[in-house]
Curated annotation (Swiss-Prot):
Organism whose genome encodes this protein: Vaccinia virus (strain Ankara)
Transmembrane segments: 276-294
Keyword Cell membrane among UniProt keywords: no
Induction / repression: Expressed in the late phase of the viral replicative cycle.
Protein name from the UniProt record: Cell surface-binding protein OPG105
Pfam family, one: Carb_anhydrase
GO cellular component, one term: virion membrane
Record note on modification: Apparently non-glycosylated.
Key words of the record: Disulfide bond, Host-virus interaction, Late protein, Membrane, Transmembrane, Transmembrane helix, Viral attachment to host cell, Viral envelope protein, Virion, Virus entry into host cell
Residues of the Alpha-carbonic anhydrase domain: 1-235
């Protein structure tokens, strides 16, 4: 069977629980960013130090780089999807098996050589002070194929989500140059729209018409799952993945739009087709009640 290409859409109901998926041991306290690059396609930060172990990993995997993906709009920009939900952006943390292989280049030749951790970015009303450390460096790499020292104190641990349950599957790197085991945290970290928009001001390597272009988007669309591809999950991942505030807000907006549509039908048919108008206004009342109870529950969850 051909290798599963990445990224993919993760269907939570089809993910398989695996007792071997223990919590990861993440040791980023000694990781230090050395350089930040505009590759013409994405932003990459190279690291020295830091590793992951534990969980289902046979040994330590050393942190190599951080890569960031985004879209033209704040509503979409992640490579991976959770139940067809696309987040605002995605961070990929690339690690390699230093104990078994002599270099990153050697490790990428093997299916147990690379581990990539995926962290979703979700636009919210508040700036992320830790993510801002990266945003502050972007002016130094605005031109394509440029690199600069990362000249700020930066603690990668601060970009980890609040919940570390995860999905995992065997796929490939985003550019399909190597096999990779993916570890995907479904709980996103929040950033502000202004922070994400800064990435869209970076110049791209594309200049087919002789004019400068910007990296307005660089995410990949998901690939279809192979018949033999298995996606596993740990802990309470299904519940965590399906109750995000962003998902609930989107659903509430959809219900609100549907209510307005029903009310417009009521106004349109009240003088003519009274039966249709009555059905429409009944739906308005039902949707209003649903929205009220959802907003009450959401308010209580925020307070807790």
């Amino acid at each position: 069977m051909p290798q599963q290409l990445s990224p993919i859409n993760i269907e939570t109901k089809k993910a398989i629980s695996n007792a071997r998926l223990k919590p990861l041991d993440i040791h980023y306290n000694e990781s230090k960013p050395t350089t930040i690059q505009n590759t013409g396609k994405l932003v990459r930060i190279n690291f020295k130090g830091g590793y992951i172990s534990g969980g289902f990993l046979p040994n330590e995997y050393v942190l190599s780089s951080l890569r960031i993906y985004w879209g033209k709009e704040d509503d979409y920009g992640s490579n991976h999807l959770i139940d067809v939900y696309k987040y605002s952006g995605e961070i990929n943390l690339v690690h390699w098996n230093k104990k078994k292989y002599s270099s990153y280049e050697e490790a990428k030749k093997h299916d147990d050589g690379l581990i990539i951790i995926s962290i979703f970015l979700q636009v919210s009303d508040h700036k992320n002070v830790y993510f801002q450390k990266i945003v502050n460096q972007l002016d130094s790499i605005r031109s394509t194929n440029t690199s600069a020292p990362f000249d700020s104190v930066f603690y990668l641990d601060n970009l980890l989500p609040s919940k570390l349950d995860y999905f995992t599957y065997l796929g490939t790197t985003i550019n399909h140059s190597a096999d990779a085991v993916w570890i995907i945290f479904p709980t996103p970290i929040n950033i502000h729209s202004d922070q994400l928009s800064k990435f869209r001001t970076l110049l791209s390597s594309s200049n087919h018409d002789g004019k400068p272009h910007y990296i307005t988007e660089n995410y990949r669309n998901p690939y279809k799952l192979n018949d033999d591809t298995q996606v596993y999950y740990s802990g309470e991942i299904i519940r965590a993945a399906t109750t995000s505030p962003a998902r609930e807000n989107y659903f509430m907006r959809w219900l609100s739009d549907l209510r307005e549509t029903c009310f417009s039908y009521y106004q349109k048919y009240i003088e003519g087709n009274k039966t249709f108008a009555i059905i429409a206004i009944v739906f308005v009342f039902i949707l209003t009640a649903i929205l009220f109870f959802m907003s009450q529950r959401y308010s209580r969850e925020k307070q807790n």
